Amino acid sequence: MSLPHLRRLEAEAIHVIREVVATFSNPVVLYSIGKDSSVLLHLAMKAFYPAKPPFPFLHVDTKWKFREMIEFRDRMARELGFDLLVHVNQDGVEQGIGPFTHGSNVHTHVMKTMGLRQALEKYGFDAALAGARRDEEKSRAKERIFSIRSAQHGWDPQRQRPEMWKTYNTRVGQGETMRVFPLSNWTEFDIWQYILREEIPIVPLYFAARRPVVKREGMLIMVDDDRMPIQPEEEVTEQLVRFRTLGCYPLTGAVESDAVTVPEILREMLTVRTSERQSRLIDTDEVGAMEKKKREGYF
């Protein structure tokens, strides 16, 4: 598959990754295990081949990820040999914080946002690369590739710096850090084309299969373990579904689909008119949800 635009996107992303290594003393990749993280992992491996990437990969584990995601994470770390760090907010675990008991907003803030902030401070990382893209969500659409964060890890859109002619300002003040998004200019379709071209392994949840789901708040939520309470009016049914995006399983909706290969997913996407993140409850639990979370230190 020869697609010139994919070569340009790949070159830009590798340039950004190398720029981070050249200008920061202690960078890390935020590895959330999804398709974008898989592409970012692949690009990082390419950027420094035959050497290993000169930075670790950090997964902030909320303890509510799909089981297949955790199995995939551990398998990739074994097979590729990259340095994997897993951080859990133990304060949240001790308090029993979860999506069912405390709601999506509190769960995400404590287990993801605060967990990430804890990990960045624990290891002293000054730059964190992540796989967010501008086409995913409106607050991400206005964020720069190099996104400066305050000493409290907050994002202020008014402090963003111009990025003209692929020239990046990587300087940070005392206590400040940088979030870096090498895939900013990619689209969901680009991601899948690149996965096809490069034969990148991804979590099987992206492919259609018969899975146990319940319909809740207009979404098909997969019953991944026995911690999920089933309401009296709800019925668990086996349906042919897949996921366009992955997160904590109680907060991530599946879509009805029969696409079981990457080419079939690409064909399916030609008819899709909604964002992949419309099936993420954390993006809709309040007005301006994603921007508010980013201002508090979210990815």
UniProtKB/Swiss-Prot annotation:
Residues annotated as signal peptide: none
Database matches in CDD domains: Sulfate_adenylyltransferase_2
Biological-process GO terms, alphabetical: hydrogen sulfide biosynthetic process; sulfate assimilation
InterPro entries in the cross-refs: PAPS_reduct_dom, Rossmann-like_a/b/a_fold, SO4_adenylTrfase_ssu, Sulfate_adenylyltrnsfr_sub2
Keywords: ATP-binding, Nodulation, Nucleotide-binding, Nucleotidyltransferase, Plasmid, Transferase
Statement: the UniProt record of this protein carries the keyword Nucleotide-binding: yes
Pfam families cross-referenced by the UniProt entry: PAPS_reduct
One function term, GO molecular function aspect: sulfate adenylyltransferase (ATP) activity
Recorded catalytic activity of this chain's protein: sulfate + ATP + H(+) = adenosine 5'-phosphosulfate + diphosphate
EC number(s) reported in the record: 2.7.7.4
First-level EC class: transferase
Complex formation: Sulfate-activating enzymes, NodP and NodQ, may be physically associated.
Stated family: Belongs to the PAPS reductase family. CysD subfamily.
Task performed by this protein: Proposed to provide activated sulfate for transfer to nod factor.
Protein name: Sulfate adenylyltransferase subunit 2
Species, as recorded: Rhizobium meliloti (strain 1021) (Ensifer meliloti)
Gene giving rise to this polypeptide: nodP
